[in-house]
């Protein structure tokens, strides 16, 4: 569990928030983990810096951001999923939000592929895709200094949505030539991290957990 709320992570940052009257071209959808889990918060804060550096006009929902409902749907809680979906789509419509970027593969998949069934007419991009575009446009010029790095293909980004090249382009942009070392199981054959499909909440013995095998 966590005692954090959805706005605590950006209290010291100068960012637009839609419910404060701010307007922006793009919504940065942070997600539950991105706003309340320490390790993921670091990713969210880094993403804000990247967006600012590239001059992207973006805003946050803050306290008005509700879970996409992905975990609930995966474990059979369809009613909870639909309640979350309805509330989020109403929020998108209220602020005229049409473009969304997110760092979470699960949120990405749900917003992009499942929300349209409920009227969620959105352009949804993963942050790696957005950053790849910014690199090609010359709006980001990172310094490559990582001498050894690997990349894990998340199930919902890779197998479900076939986003393979953008993350690698981004990783290579901050690495020395040849620094990216592929895992034995990669791309469509990537080994699940053991957190999706509600599995993160299953009470398996450690030796039987997917992430331990991985």
Predicted regions, residues:
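Redox cofactor-anchoring modules in respiratory/redox and cofactor-processing assemblies
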Residues: 135-214
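Short, well-ordered coil/turn elements that cap or connect secondary structure elements
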Residues: 53, 119-121, 146, 175
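Surface-exposed, flexible loop/turn segments at secondary-structure boundaries
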Residues: 34, 108, 132, 157, ...
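Short, structured patches in soluble enzyme cores that scaffold and shape functional sites
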Residues: 30, 104, 126-128, 153
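Short, acidic/turn-prone active-site loops that include or flank metal/cofactor-
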Residues: 126-132, 185
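Iron-sulfur-cluster electron-transfer modules
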Residues: 1-103, 108-115, 119, 137
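Ferredoxin-type iron-sulfur electron-transfer modules in oxidoreductases and energy-metabolism complexes
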Residues: 1, 80-83, 87, 123, ...
């Amino acid at each position: 569990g966590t005692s954090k709320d959805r706005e605590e992570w950006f209290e010291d940052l100068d960012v637009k928030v839609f419910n404060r009257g701010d307007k922006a071209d793009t919504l940065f959808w942070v997600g539950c983990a991105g706003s309340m889990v320490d390790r993921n918060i670091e990713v969210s804060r880094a993403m804000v810096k990247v967006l600012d550096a590239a001059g992207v006009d973006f805003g946050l929902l803050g306290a008005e951001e509700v879970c996409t409902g992905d975990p609930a749907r995966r474990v059979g809680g369809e009613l909870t999923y639909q309640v979350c979906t309805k509330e989020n789509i109403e929020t998108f419509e209220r602020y005229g939000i049409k473009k969304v970027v997110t760092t979470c593969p699960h949120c990405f998949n749900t917003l992009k592929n499942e929300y349209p069934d409920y009227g969620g007419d959105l352009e949804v991009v993963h942050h790696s895709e957005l950053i790849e575009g910014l690199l090609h446009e010359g709006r980001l010029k990172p310094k490559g200094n990582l001498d050894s790095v690997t990349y894990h293909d998340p199930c919902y980004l890779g197998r479900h949505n076939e986003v393979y090249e953008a993350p690698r382009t981004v990783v290579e942009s901050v690495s020395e030539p040849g620094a990216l070392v592929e895992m034995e199981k990669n791309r469509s054959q990537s080994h699940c991290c053991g957190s999706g499909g509600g599995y993160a909440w299953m009470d398996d013995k450690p030796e039987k957990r997917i992430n331990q095998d991985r």
